Amino acid sequence: MFGQTTLGIDSVSSSASRVFRFEVVGMRQNEENDKNKYNIRRSGSVYITVPYNRMSEEMQRIHRLGGKIVKIEPLTRAAG
């Protein structure tokens, strides 16, 4: 079909193991995150570690909570 891409098994497994760290500012306490057992800091940055397959979902959640993503960086595993 037009617009679809076929991925091999290698590309799926490599994307499943990739992890990224979001630096977020402006998160605010609201009804959604009041369900957590901790408060969100009002000052400074919050760092959130996210697997590749959940990046879109996490970006939407951050936006709903009033946060702004200022940096996204890949986390690499130490060789060894």
UniProtKB/Swiss-Prot annotation:
Keywords: Antenna complex, Membrane, Photosynthesis, Phycobilisome, Thylakoid. One of its GO terms (biological process) is photosynthesis. Rod linker protein, associated with phycocyanin. Linker polypeptides determine the state of aggregation and the location of the disk-shaped phycobiliprotein units within the phycobilisome and modulate their spectroscopic properties in order to mediate a directed and optimal energy transfer. SMART domains: CpcD (SM01094). This is Phycobilisome 8.9 kDa linker polypeptide, phycocyanin-associated, rod. Belongs to the phycobilisome linker protein family. Pfam families: CpcD. It comes from Mastigocladus laminosus (Fischerella sp.). Residues 17-75 form the CpcD-like domain. GO terms for cellular component: phycobilisome; plasma membrane-derived thylakoid membrane. It is a peripheral membrane protein. It is found in: Cellular thylakoid membrane. The gene is cpcD.
